Amino acid sequence: GPLQRGAMVGGLDEAMAAVVRDRAGIGVEVVVTDLHTAFLRPAHGPVAASARVTGGGRVLCFCEAEARDAAGQVVATAMGTYRIRPKATVGEAACT
């Protein structure tokens, strides 16, 4: 059957977060603040996600991603906004 949509969203989110982490460097954590996904067609079999940074600065980063099936057809797209912040240290509240 087709790939479950939640798995597709998770893959697109992780692809975008990875490019933000690569850009931001070590010592930071990346948190999604806004995510929009469009499902274009059912995905059967393996799916590959790719992402790129489209803008932003030191605190917020904007990204786009797409998922393609084994035939190279785009099956889903996403846009996300990610917050970049210093990693919490031991004893620091996680919800700040």
Regions found by a protein language model. Name each.
Residues 1-17:
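Hot-dog-fold acyl-thioester-processing enzymes
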Residues 42-46, 54-96:
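HotDog/MaoC-like acyl-thioester-processing domains
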Residues 1, 38, 58:
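Flexible, active-site-adjacent loop/turn segments at secondary-structure boundaries
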Residues 12, 21-22, 72:
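Short, function-defining helix-loop hinge/capping sites that tune catalysis or transport
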Residues 17-48, 53-54:
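Hydrophobic beta-strand-centered segment that forms part of the acyl-chain substrate-binding groove
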Residues 4, 25-27, 70:
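Residue-level detector of alpha-helix boundary/anchor positions
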